[in-house]
A protein has these predicted regions:
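Bacterial Sec-dependent N-terminal signal peptides
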Residues: 1-26
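Transmembrane beta-strand segments that form the barrel wall of outer-membrane beta-barrel proteins
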Residues: 24-37, 50-61, 153-161
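Membrane-spanning beta-strands of outer-membrane beta-barrel proteins
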Residues: 25, 35, 77-79, 130-132, ...
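Membrane-embedded beta-strand positions in outer-membrane beta-barrel channels/transporters
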Residues: 29, 39-41, 81-85, 134-136, ...
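Gram-negative (and chloroplast) outer-membrane scaffold detector with strong preference
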Residues: 46-151
Length: 180
């Protein structure tokens, strides 16, 4: 009797775990990030279960880099950012509830900066709109008790293409997503 119960338990465990792993990656997810850039994101998973397209809208320079040299002046404030990332998403071998992802895409920023005026030591405010490339890598956890939620941590970088080529900015953060 114990062997039969063990076989039935194993069968339900295997069927249930496959269904749980499949249900974690829904078609869409939306959430927020605390970090750089901070804000809201929406993600659309592809049918192959590996790729995703993510759009992030939020702040730029809020966590680190608020007071930083830029061209012939400095940033002294928080700006706005939007980026679109093409991602590759994989469950880890250690735990199917733990996924890794990485990707890249374009990023647009808008931020005030203060140009130095050598003649009278006053700063003139200018609006800097910039375009560049961003890359990211992260880890995401899908709790078994809350299959529609996921928690993530990521790190990446932004390098500006225009107007200040090769301006480098570290990015990353933590956040939560709702999968639906």
């Amino acid at each position: 009797m114990n062997l039969k119960l063990l076989k039935i338990s194993c069968m339900f465990l295997l069927l249930g775990s496959g269904n749980a792993a499949y249900s974690q990656l829904q078609e869409w997810s939306a959430g927020f990030r605390i970090g750089e850039p901070g804000g809201f994101m929406a993600r659309r998973y592809s049918d192959n279960g590996i790729n995703a397209l993510e759009v992030n809208i939020g702040t730029y320079g809020g966590l680190w880099g608020t007071d930083r040299k830029y061209q012939d002046g400095t940033f002294n404030n928080i700006g706005y950012s939007i980026n679109v990332l093409y991602l590759w998403h994989h469950p880890t071998i250690i735990n199917s509830d733990l996924h890794t992802y990485y990707g890249f895409g374009p990023q647009l920023n808008s931020r005030d900066w203060y140009a130095n005026k050598a003649s009278n030591n006053l700063a003139a405010t200018k609006r800097a709109s910039a375009m560049g490339a961003t890359a990211v890598g992260g880890i995401e956890y899908f709790p078994i008790d809350a299959p529609n939620l996921s928690f993530f941590s990521e790190i990446g970088f932004y390098t500006e293409i225009a107007p200040n080529p090769f301006f480098f900015h570290l990015q990353g953060g933590i956040g939560v997503r709702v999968n639906f």
